[in-house]
């Protein structure tokens, strides 16, 4: 039986311009750690940048694309071109997604990967949607307390070094996608990435900034430093980098499929390095990894159908709960980012994230997970009814049920097949450990290291997500495909940014459906975020007017202004009258290419 325990906020309206803002400031670099070229120190907390009538649209032309027949969007222009070339040569959307993902593993090493994992939602031309889970798993020797010291305090072992890595799923995921839905020969999809790794590619400004920002971590591991910080000097924009060992690893995948990674020389290299560095991944862990096909969640919003990921992704649940709780709220009639708009959505997110953090995990380990109850409209209506005109204390928000870094790509082909694929190392540059030219993930931090203790994203999670051998850690990745009321493909979207993926994806969807924006504006408009704990509303520059800030504080909210890439990087494709519009987030450095 569902019982209400308390809850929250709303009312008060303040007008707010719906023009889009200037671009957010760049992310702050990390502190110097002996890198030869100076590394800029972290800046002090930013002063609030409020929205004004002068705030204008900022949609970078190079990050927009239009195509009458197909569209590819990713976070790296070189990878986007690889995907577009595959489509132009007769491949389908899945082929393009696979080739783009492998290219991202070379040219976008902070998140693109062989040593990580992710999720994909695919809608075939007939309209049927499927979901693939290639999330990493805990090694067989993992234990629930493996990251606690003798006093029971969490250590940094879940974030840095060999013990931070889960068993990678990315290669198995690409192999499974191709086996079920691919069209072109496998080798043709891997070859472009091999060429980029073997022949080299030019480091762009964004990658150079990322290398410099994360140089202290990369310098901890010789195999990472020699590629990205040679002689303790971060690779500069305009320089060319080739990664011969990565080319060899990709050649094995080209020739042997998934077995070329999970068995043989590459697997042996991973197991050997893990043992030498105190990691837990073994050859048996690698050989036993399997990607899992799952039934996507389907939720309704304003006459649209949203197809998104089920657990162990939490993104689909939170997106679905948000849609259900906002069913009766006419967001499009509210001043955009005025008090009532922000307040209503924040309160919905607080409830949805509370359920996410406490109840969700790997369905193979968490029995009787209440997915259906969490998405049931009567339950969501009761939750929505508890929202009041002022903020409810976080202690009074609980699930009322008994019982940077990631990267995303979106593809649509000429038949209407669509792919939203999100893959990750967890934080930027993962564990910092490079094996055979590719970085390993630090996804073990996405487990509950200690109930009640926050992870690197500030998420405070429960025992449902505790570490267990072979278990998939809970994720916030939210690849989503949207159909209109006629059942026609309308929107493909996904993002990067930890738990902010969920709120960034939601705001992109809402901007299109509720406010009728173009896809470029929907992505560029500034964002806000709340994840239940820590209990603050995070505000992007030029997101709200000063009067709205004042009303939020008066209603009991802690308001935190944040700069940089903290609000996620989304990519999306929107159907328009004469084809497809694609947009890469101006917070990142991606590209959209169509034809």
Residue ranges and their predicted role:
Residues 1-14:
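Sec-dependent bacterial lipoprotein signal peptides
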Residues 38-81, 93-94, 98-257, 261-263, ...:
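Noncatalytic scaffold domains of N-terminal-nucleophile
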Residues 470-472, 505-506, 514-564:
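Extended C-terminal subregions enriched in glycine
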Residues 86-87, 172-180, 256-263, 268, ...:
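Alpha-helical support elements that line or immediately flank enzyme active sites
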Residues 50, 328-424, 435, 451-452, ...:
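Internal maturation/activation junctions in enzymes
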């Amino acid at each position: 039986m569902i019982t209400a325990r308390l809850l929250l906020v709303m009312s008060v309206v303040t007008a707010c311009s719906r023009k889009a803002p200037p671009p957010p400031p760049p992310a702050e670099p990390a502190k110097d750690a002996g890198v030869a070229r100076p590394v800029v120190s972290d800046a002090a907390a930013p002063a609030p940048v409020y929205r004004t009538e002068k705030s204008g649209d900022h949609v970078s032309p190079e990050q927009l694309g239009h195509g009458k027949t197909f569209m590819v969007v990713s976070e790296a222009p070189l990878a986007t071109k690889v995907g577009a070339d595959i489509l132009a040569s007769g491949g389908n959307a899945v082929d393009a997604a696979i080739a783009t993902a492998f290219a991202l593993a070379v040219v976008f090493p902070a998140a693109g990967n062989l040593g990580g994992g992710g999720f994909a939602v695919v809608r075939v031309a007939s309209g049927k949607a499927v979901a693939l889970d290639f999330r990493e798993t805990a090694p067989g020797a993992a234990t629930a307390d493996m990251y606690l010291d003798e006093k029971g305090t969490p250590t940094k072992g879940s974030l840095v070094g060999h013990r931070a890595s889960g068993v990678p799923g990315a290669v198995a995921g690409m192999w499974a996608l191709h086996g079920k839905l691919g069209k072109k020969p496998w080798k043709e999809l891997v070859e472009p990435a091999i060429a980029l790794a073997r022949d080299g590619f030019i480091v762009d400004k964004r990658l150079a900034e990322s290398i410099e920002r994360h140089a202290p971590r990369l310098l901890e591991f010789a195999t990472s430093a020699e590629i990205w910080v040679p002689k303790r000097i971060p690779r500069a924009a305009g320089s060319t980098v080739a990664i011969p060992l990565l080319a060899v690893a990709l050649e094995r995948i080209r020739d042997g499929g998934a077995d070329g990674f999970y068995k043989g020389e590459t697997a042996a290299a991973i197991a050997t390095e893990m043992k030498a560095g105190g990691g837990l991944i073994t050859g048996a862990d690698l050989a036993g990894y399997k990607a899992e096909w799952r039934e996507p969640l389907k939720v309704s919003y304003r006459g649209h159908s949203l197809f998104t990921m089920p657990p162990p992704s939490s993104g689909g649940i939170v997106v679905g709960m948000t849609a259900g709780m906002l069913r009766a709220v006419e967001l499009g009639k509210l001043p955009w980012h005025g008090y009532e708009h922000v307040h209503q959505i924040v309160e919905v997110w607080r409830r949805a994230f509370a359920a996410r953090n406490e109840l969700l995990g790997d369905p193979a380990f968490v029995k009787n997970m209440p997915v259906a109850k969490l998405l049931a409209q009567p339950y969501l209506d009761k939750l929505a009814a508890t929202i009041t005109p002022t903020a409810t204390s976080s202690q009074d928000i609980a699930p009322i049920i008994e019982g940077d870094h990631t990267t995303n790509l979106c593809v649509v082909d000429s038949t209407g097949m669509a792919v939203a694929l999100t893959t990750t190392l967890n934080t930027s540059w993962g564990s910092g450990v490079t094996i055979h030219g590719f970085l390993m993930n630090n996804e073990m931090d996405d487990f509950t290291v200690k109930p009640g203790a926050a992870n690197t994203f500030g998420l405070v999670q429960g025992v449902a997500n505790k570490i267990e051998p072979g278990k998939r850690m809970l994720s916030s990745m939210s690849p989503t495909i949207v159909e209109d009321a006629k059942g026609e493909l309308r929107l493909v979207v996904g993002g990067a940014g930890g738990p902010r993926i969920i709120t960034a994806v939601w705001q992109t969807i809402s901007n299109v459906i509720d406010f009728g924006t173009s896809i470029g504006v929907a992505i560029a408009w500034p964002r806000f975020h709340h994840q239940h704990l820590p209990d603050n509303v995070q505000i992007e520059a030029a997101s709200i007017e000063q009067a709205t800030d004042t009303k939020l504080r008066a209603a009991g909210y802690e308001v935190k202004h944040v700069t940089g890439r903290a609000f996620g990087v989304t990519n999306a494709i929107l159907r328009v009258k004469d084809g497809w519009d694609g947009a890469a987030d101006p917070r990142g450095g991606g590209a959209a290419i169509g034809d």
